[in-house]
Amino acid sequence: MMRYAIMQLGPLVLRCVRDRLAKLPLIALLLAAGASPGLADQPALANEQVLRLVTANMPRSLDPINIDAQRIINNGFAEPLVHQSLDGARLIPAIARSWTLVEPTLWRIELQPNARFWSGAPVDAEAVRAALERHQRANPRARALLQGASFRAAGPTTLEIRTAAPDPAFLFKTVTIGIHNAAAAEAMGDRFHREADLTGYFRPTRFIPGELIVGEPFEGHWGPRPRLNRIEARFVVDPQTRFLAMQAGEAEMDGNVQIEQRRAYLRLNRFNFPPVNSTTWNVWLNFRHPLLADAGIREALSLGVNRDEIVGGVLRPIAVHATGHFPAGLPYAIATRQFSDPARARQLLDELGWRPGPDGVRVRNGQRLEFRVLTYGWWHSAAVALEAQWRRIGVGITLRVVEPTASNQIMLDGDFEIATYCSCGSATGDLHGQLRAFYQTGVTQNWGRYSNPQVDALIDKLQGEFDEARRFDLARQIQTLVQRDHALIYVANSDLIGIAHAPRVRGADPDRPRDITPGMFIVAR
C-alpha cells in the first residue's frame, strides 16, 4: 500500500522559530533558563508535591464538548489524540501513540494500548470514535474542525479517520478536542458536567464549577505517574491578587500574567517564566452590525488605532508591530502592515458623511457613530487605549468589561460589536485549519462573520495542498485579502510572559509551557 509522508513543517519554519527566540530580550532568556532543572534540584517530600494554580480561566464544566470546559487539557484532566509542539511544527503523542496517512484522505491511528477512562472502561478505538462523533455533533467549536470526517474502529486500538478531502494537517485540528467516555455522557446527562469520565493523568477530587478544581494522580493512567501529588486550581480574576498570592507563597503558578504585573514579577527576580509563543493581538469586528459591514468604517477604525502608542507604551517591551494574521517573521506571514493614520481616518469619515457632533462623536442622519467594545482581563488596558484613540477620530466607545470565562459564550452568541477577544493568530502546523476558523464563511470561530468568496476558495485550495512552498504562498494570499478587507484589526505581535512559576517549580515541558504536565515537581527548600 502506498504511504504518504505525514506533513511536518520544514527546516525553514524551524529556523524562523529559532531566530524569533534568539531575538527575545536577554532577561527573558535568563529567566527562562532559571526554570530548567539542575543537578542539585532534589524533589521535596511527597506531602509537599502540591502545585496551586491561580488563573482567570476556570472550567465551568468538565464535559469536553462544553464551550466553558476551560483548561481541562492544560491541567491534565483531559487528553486529545495528540498535542502540538510550541513552535507548531510537530505533533506529540497523547491518546494516539502513532499515526500514518495511508491515503490522501485516510489516516490510520494506533491508540495507547493500556489507556483507560477514570471509570476503568477501556479507551479503545470504538470509544474514541464515539467521542469524536459526539464532538462533531454537539461541540460548536469542533464541528467545523471535524466537518466531513468519518471515524471507524478498524481494530481494538486502531482508529481510521476518513476526511472529505485531502488534508495533510488534519491531526493538528484535534489538539484541543478532549477524548471522553461518550457512552457515559449520554447515560448521565447533565451530571456529566460535574462527573465526567475522562482519561487525564490527574483526576478531580473536588470541583466547584468556575471556582475551584482539585486533582490527584489517576493511578490507572497509561503514561508516567505525575510527580505532583495534588494540584489545586482556583479562579482569581484580579491580576494583582494573583501576583500577591505568588509573592506570599500562597500559589506556585500564575496562569495569566497580565501586562501590568509583568514588570513587578521581573523586579522581584525570583520567578520563572517558561517561554510561550508569540501571537498576533487582533480586534474582532462584528459584520452583522450594519455600520461595521461598511468597509469604509472598518478602514477608518483601523487607521485610527495608534499602534506606535500601544506597542511602545501599553505593551512595552513585550510587543512589536503586527503585519497580518500570523506573527511577523514566520515563513508564511506577510510583511505588509495595517497603517495608523488618524488624520486620514477623520478625512475618510468626513467623506462618508459622518460629521462631529457637539460632544465630538460623529453623527450622520441622526445616528451616532458609536460602538460597545467587549473586553476583559489582560486586554483591558489596551482596550482603554483604543477607546481614547477612537474618540480622537470621532467614534464613541463604551467598554463592556466581563470575566474571561463569560466572554466565550458572548462571542459564540455573536452578542458583541467590537471585541478584544483573545482568539489570536500563532505559529501552527495547520495553516488551513487556523485560517479557516478565522475567515471562512459560516465557520463558528469566525466570530465576526466575515465573508469573501475569493478567500473561501483559497482556503479550500489550501486544505489539500501537500507542497510546503505552495501552502505558504496560499496562506500569504489569504492574509493579503483579509487585511485589505479589514476583516480584523491587527494591533501587535506580543511575546507575553503568560505564565509565572514559583522558584521551587521544576520540570515544565518546553513544548507545553501553559500546561501542568507529569514531569513537573516541587524542589526541596
List each model region and its residues.
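Ligand-site clamp/hinge motif
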Residues: 218-264, 387-388, 396-404
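Gly/Pro-rich hinge or "lid" segments in bacterial periplasmic/extracellular proteins
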Residues: 85-86, 174-226, 230, 238-240, ...
